[in-house]
Amino acid sequence: MSIPEITQTLLQAKKDQGLSFADLEAILGRNEVWIAALFYRQASASEEEAKLLVEALGLDPSYIQHLTEYPIKGLGPIVPTDPLIYRFYEIMQVYGFPIKQVIQEKFGDGIMSAIDFTLDVEKEADPKGDRVKITMSGKFLPYKKW
């Protein structure tokens, strides 16, 4: 998978400015995961958000237009090769159908929205090794009968 040029530019500017995604969350008022998705062109910013980001990163204002364009979503191969991303694929391979069954028992026949959706990543201290806590919250959408 090749990283888009604009993504490389944004990541380098973030590094050059000594900023984290959490720092940018405070500046933009958006979740750090959403901001990372914006960097990878999996989300689009409002003009105001793009201006704030470009200013924080010290980039030329011409980047505002790129950040406000609607992106083509979905990045990378169907089976991911990055080890961290592959773990999520593996989790879905193992637990996808069990999660689906539990959701359907609780909500009925439908899906969890990835549009009306939030995702948070937290670090949990553990004496056996720090843990990654990921919380996904998506609106339940029942299938329509007609």
Curated annotation (Swiss-Prot):
- What EC number(s) is this enzyme filed under? 4.2.1.104
What Pfam families is this protein classified in?
A: Cyanate_lyase (PF02560)
Q: Which GO terms describe its biological process?
A: cyanate metabolic process
Catalysed reaction, written as an equation = cyanate + hydrogencarbonate + 3 H(+) = NH4(+) + 2 CO2
Query: GO molecular function: any one?
Result: DNA binding
- Domain of life where this protein originates: Bacteria
Catalytic residues, per the record, are 87, 90, 113
The record's section on SMART domains has: Cyanate_lyase (SM01116)
Q: Which InterPro entries match?
A: Cyanase, Cyanate_lyase_C, Cyanate_lyase_C_sf, Lambda_DNA-bd_dom_sf
Keywords assigned by UniProt, alphabetized: Lyase
Role of this protein: Catalyzes the reaction of cyanate with bicarbonate to produce ammonia and carbon dioxide.
Q: Which family does it belong to?
A: Belongs to the cyanase family.
Name the UniProt record assigns to this protein: Cyanate hydratase
Tell me the organism: Trichormus variabilis (strain ATCC 29413 / PCC 7937) (Anabaena variabilis)
